[in-house]
Amino acid sequence: MRFTARERAGIVVGAVLGTDCALHLFWATTGSSWPATTEESLSRGLLNADFAFTPRVLYPLAAILLAATLMVLTRSGLFPWLAARVPGWLPTLVTIGVSAAVLIRAIAGIVWITGIDSSAATWFYRLNLLLYTPACLAMFAGCIAVLRSHCNQNA
């Protein structure tokens, strides 16, 4: 099967969002701090701060990530069955929201890379430099590709 550029961009963004959703569900259901050894080191590595990774926090985040995944894939033209069941503006609005969120995170990541409020000796700094910020920039580009391409949506 050949995918259009819009569909490929949606698949990439959806894969990242879906993987993030799966990780949140894993942490919520198992209580594991994988891939870190402790919840504190997980929080520090992911967020550069101490936050509790409790089901009360993780389940709502997983639900938001799942909804975002479905809407981006729908806006990409990959889920026509879902496009027929939601207002046509909803996948577009959610994709705009995802693009804004990842752009803001990418800008924050660039600030942290400069050393503002982040130490180069931490795992967070290295992960932010090599993974988080590049992934957010790629997701932003993917969202723009999804949004720029014409996609028939049911109104």
Residue ranges of model-derived segments:
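N-terminal signal-anchor transmembrane alpha helix
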Residues: 10-29
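Short, well-structured hydrophobic secondary-structure segments
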Residues: 50-75
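Transmembrane alpha-helical segments of integral membrane proteins
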Residues: 107-119
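Interfacial loop at the N-terminal end of multi-pass membrane proteins
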Residues: 3, 23-58, 79-84, 116, ...
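Cytoplasmic juxtamembrane regions at transmembrane-helix boundaries
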Residues: 2-5, 71-96, 154-155
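Individual transmembrane alpha-helices with interfacial aromatic-anchor signatures
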Residues: 90-97, 122-139
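Hydrophobic alpha-helical membrane segments
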Residues: 95-110
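Hydrophobic cores of alpha-helical transmembrane segments in multi-pass inner/ER membrane proteins
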Residues: 60-69, 131-146
